[in-house]
């Protein structure tokens, strides 16, 4: 079960963000952006001189149970991107994508 699902554009603005407890919506929005800052710091450190390879480690990014959720989300995102009426960079407003996210959030693993 997911508590928050976000799709972030390459330019760091949200294309889609949804959280289960709606009263914590701003908190999750903040957490998504701060986690992106950690990834940006690790990537920018790669360009600097002689970086210790252990410093680039972000942690286990795909536990087995989370891999299925990511695959389902990625397949649905690919369907949105392949829609000829979707303009890349616009907010995701697909009903099918929203239904898939809803099913992921209420699904008990």
UniProtKB/Swiss-Prot annotation:
Instruction: Tell me which Gene Ontology terms the entry assigns under biological process.
Output: endoplasmic reticulum to Golgi vesicle-mediated transport
Q: Which domain of life is it from?
A: Eukaryota
Claim: Cytoplasm is one of the keywords in the record? yes
Task: Name its cellular compartments.
Answer: Cytoplasm, Perinuclear region; Endoplasmic reticulum; Golgi apparatus
Q: What is its main location?
A: cytoplasm
* Keyword Acetylation recorded: no
Pfam families for this protein? Sedlin_N (PF04628)
| Keywords carried by this UniProt record | Cytoplasm, Endoplasmic reticulum, ER-Golgi transport, Golgi apparatus, Transport
Cellular component annotations (GO), alphabetically ordered: endoplasmic reticulum; Golgi apparatus; perinuclear region of cytoplasm
Function statement: May play a role in vesicular transport from endoplasmic reticulum to Golgi.
Quaternary form?
Component of the multisubunit TRAPP (transport protein particle) complex, which includes at least TRAPPC2, TRAPPC2L, TRAPPC3, TRAPPC3L, TRAPPC4, TRAPPC5, TRAPPC8, TRAPPC9, TRAPPC10, TRAPPC11 and TRAPPC12. Interacts with the heterodimer TRAPPC3-TRAPPC6A.
What name is this protein filed under?
A: Trafficking protein particle complex subunit 2-like protein
Q: Which organism is it from?
A: Pongo abelii
Higher taxonomy: Eukaryota, Metazoa, Chordata, Craniata, Vertebrata
């Amino acid at each position: 079960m997911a508590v928050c699902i976000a799709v972030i554009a390459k330019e760091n603005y949200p294309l889609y963000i949804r959280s289960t407890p709606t009263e914590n919506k701003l908190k999750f929005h903040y957490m998504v952006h701060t986690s992106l800052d950690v990834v940006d710091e690790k990537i920018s450190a790669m360009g600097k001189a002689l970086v210790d390879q252990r410093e680039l480690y972000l942690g286990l990014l795909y536990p087995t149970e989370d891999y299925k959720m990511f695959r389902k989300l990625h397949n649905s995102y690919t369907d949105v991107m392949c829609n000829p009426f979707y303009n890349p960079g616009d907010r995701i407003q697909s009903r099918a994508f929203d239904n898939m996210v809803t099913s992921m959030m209420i699904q008990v693993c």
